[in-house]
């Protein structure tokens, strides 16, 4: 498996990972991974977007992940399984909006 990497590469991996697992619960969920400002090079703030809304909605804090934690553990199946469970729980908690399937078959 793979671990480590530059901040931008790890952010891209995290965005894809969050999208993949969120969409298993809600096909309209989109990942929002905050990497700017004081987070840049240090950490990631993860939220899910459904339409115009974010979850967790500000002022509630996003799911916080440190860059070293993600970079070091993204190759660990156990760590990824735990993160996937957290992301899927966020997606299940998204408020219902719009129409269409919320889950994959």
Give the label of every model feature segment.
Residues 1-37, 73-87, 105:
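Negatively charged, low-complexity tracts enriched in Asp/Glu with abundant Ser/Thr
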Residues 92, 96-105:
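Intrinsically disordered, low-complexity, Lys/Arg-biased terminal tails
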